[in-house]
Amino acid sequence: MHTDTDEHWMQMAIEVARSKGSDPATAPLGCVIVLDGKVIAAERNQTKELPDATAHAEMMAIRRACEKTGELELRGATLYSTLQPCGMCTMASIWSKVGRVVYGAGRSDVHPMYFEAKHVDTLGFIGDAYRDDIEIEGGCLRDACAELYYGPDADLNKEEQANL
């Protein structure tokens, strides 16, 4: 169960996501990584700006957190993401030894365009991972996070859809 502290950090992740704007077509994801009660990274999705297909909010935050700490491992850190991490970001969390992942909106809360892999559930990645010391929890400020994105039943033409 998420705590008031989790909600505080998730609200910060929402603010980071909103710094990209309010258009759900731009995939305004936000991510905050907290260690020992302090933010060590706060990033948003930057795939279009860089351009870099791996510049998801979680990937950027993990990079910044490792730079800030000077470490490859983020043991004891909690990663807060406004959207359920994709497979790439989930595996990066595992490999960087993040201790806990807390996300807001899940796959079923948003349009399928936000998830490239239609049959791969990141929760399955966690469950089958070689690490058993990572925790994952979804639904923290779910509704507020889901408002950032197109809804699951949004009628979008192909030109409007993109996995960003």
Residue ranges with predicted function:
Residues 40-47:
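Short beta->alpha transition motifs characteristic of CBS
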Residues 71-83:
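Immediate flanking context of iron-sulfur cluster ligation sites
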Residues 23-27:
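A short helix-loop-beta-strand connector motif used in the catalytic cores of GNAT acetyltransferases and
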Residues 49-60:
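A short, polar/charged loop-to-alpha-helix boundary motif
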Residues 41, 58-67:
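Glycine/small-residue-rich phosphate/adenosyl-binding loop
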Residues 1-22, 94-164:
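Zinc-dependent deaminase
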Residues 28-37:
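Short beta-strand scaffold segments in enzyme catalytic cores
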Residues 81-99:
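Local cysteine-cluster metal-coordination motifs and their immediate loop/turn environment
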